[in-house]
Amino acid sequence: MKNVTDSFVSLGHWPYAGSFGFNTDILATNPINLSVVLGVLIFFGKGVLSDLLDNRKQRILSTIRNSEELRGAAIEQLEKARTRLRKVEIEADEFRVNGYSEIEREKSNLINAASENLERLENYKNETIRFEQQKAINQVRQRVFQQALQGALGTLNSCLNKELHLRAISSNISILGAMKEIMD
């Protein structure tokens, strides 16, 4: 057992400055650690993220449907206003001599009110969609960050044990001893 431990300590030995060596300490190589963490994140986070995005998509679609219904109601109001406008125009032809300018004002007011109402509803729909999209993006970001953090902590906790700490400490002590001998 001591020979096995010594071989691992010698494999994890860091070369001195100015020399070339191959680092076989798996825990000290970042690309392997990063690929393991990313693999775990992708494997475990894929389903949760897709469910979250599907739920978000359904909420956004329902908001769009509600906005479309509001738009339909506004178009219906606009049609009613146009019908009323046609009625007013017929009455305007009959009473042109008595109140042409007032009828024109009423016509403009009706058109402006209907247009403003439609524009206001369209703006509300667009603001609602943007708000829901931003909210979905923020929730996804937060969820991914939490999952990444939990995965990294889980990986670290599963990799760290007492024997590994003792080997790292003894390796570092031998490196410091060798450096002290070189400096003396």
UniProtKB/Swiss-Prot annotation:
Q: Does the keyword Ubl conjugation apply?
A: no
Name the predominant localization: plastid
Keyword Transmembrane attached: yes
> Which InterPro entries does the annotation name?
ATP_synth_b/b'su_bac/chlpt
Q: Give the way it sits in the membrane.
A: Single-pass membrane protein
Coiled-coil annotated residue ranges, if any: none
One of this protein's Pfam families, by short name? ATP-synt_B
Q: For this UniProt entry, which segments traverse the membrane?
A: 27-49
The lineage's top-level taxon is Eukaryota
Q: One GO term of the cellular component aspect?
A: chloroplast thylakoid membrane
Q: Name one GO molecular function term.
A: proton-transporting ATP synthase activity, rotational mechanism
What is this protein for, i.e. what is its function?
A: F(1)F(0) ATP synthase produces ATP from ADP in the presence of a proton or sodium gradient. F-type ATPases consist of two structural domains, F(1) containing the extramembraneous catalytic core and F(0) containing the membrane proton channel, linked together by a central stalk and a peripheral stalk. During catalysis, ATP synthesis in the catalytic domain of F(1) is coupled via a rotary mechanism of the central stalk subunits to proton translocation. Component of the F(0) channel, it forms part of the peripheral stalk, linking F(1) to F(0).
What this protein is called in its record is ATP synthase subunit b, chloroplastic
